[in-house]
Regions:
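Active-site and donor-binding regions of nucleotide-sugar-utilizing enzymes
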Residues: 23, 27-49, 53-228
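Compositionally biased, charge-rich terminal segments
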Residues: 1-15
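Acidic, glycine-rich loop-and-beta core segments that form the ion-binding/anion-interacting portion
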Residues: 218, 223-247
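Hydrophobic alpha-helical transmembrane segments of integral membrane proteins
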Residues: 16-17, 140
Length: 247
């Protein structure tokens, strides 16, 4: 436990040192684009859009969903449709500009109606994450496929906000990279309430990184539903994950 805490402290220290370099990277990549100031402000917790609006008295709260890029956004879109149809509001974040553009176009109506808010993901800095969570006030967080951040998951756990990895995929090369920061990886696994893996190989690798078997479900890939019509069934309930993880 002490080793994990020390590694997390060291990780946080490195992140604080790297923030100026990351800001420079964002500037180099984006400064010629019209939304450069918006991207920087959102990544560093300076300015966010308004939270989603509850459309009726039966609203269930805001779910934060993070999808890295275009592919992950396409994959998770039908699930977000179902959650909104069941009374949840969504805050969608992306890492890449292509992912952000896809999110904005795929959910243009939902964003205009106020049922969804959309921004770039905050940098993995404790202070920035605190600002983001205070603004969004999510009841749960969904992360799509692979991209996980230690400080984000730690802060969510501290605020007792369950984190769920959906469509979880961990290739052999990614697994080796996570093994290089084993203590930090173990911390991230322990801070996830539920891991919904694409396949048994990924599930095994998540366990080897420190996830408990009770945390993991193997459910196949979400990608088969990319082209299905928008759903409005009553089969999705985020509260079910608490019961699942207690089995």
């Amino acid at each position: 436990m002490k080793k994990i805490l020390f590694c997390l402290f060291y990780y946080q220290f490195l992140i604080s040192l790297l923030k100026p370099l990351y800001r420079l990277q964002v500037w180099r990549r984006s400064h010629k684009r019209d939304n450069y100031q918006q991207e920087v402000a959102q990544r560093f917790g300076k300015q966010y859009p308004s939270p989603p609006i509850a459309m009726d008295e039966d609203h269930k709260g805001v779910i934060w969903c993070h999808a890295v890029s275009l592919g992950e956004t396409n994959t998770v879109a039908p699930l977000l449709d179902m959650l909104m149809a069941n009374g949840y509001q969504i805050w969608l974040t992306n890492t890449t500009q292509t992912g952000f553009a896809r999110g904005a176009s795929r959910f243009v109506d939902e964003i205009a109606q106020g049922r969804m808010s959309h921004s770039y993901v905050p940098v993995d800095s404790p202070a920035v994450i605190e600002t983001f969570l205070a603004h969004v006030q999510p009841i749960a967080a969904l992360f799509v496929e692979t991209e996980l951040w230690a400080n984000i998951l730690t802060k969510l756990a501290q605020h007792q906000i369950p984190s769920v990895l959906v469509n979880g995929r961990l290739s052999s090369s990614s697994f080796k990279s996570y093994q290089k920061i084993a203590a930090v990886s173990t911390s991230m696994m322990k801070n996830l309430a539920l891991i919904i893996a694409q396949d048994s190989d990924s599930a095994k690798r998540f366990r080897q990184l420190g996830a408990d078997s009770a945390q993991i479900r193997v459910a196949g890939s979400l990608k088969w539903v990319i082209n299905t019509p928008k759903a409005n069934s009553n089969t999705i309930n985020i509260d079910d994950q608490d019961a699942d993880t207690a089995e």
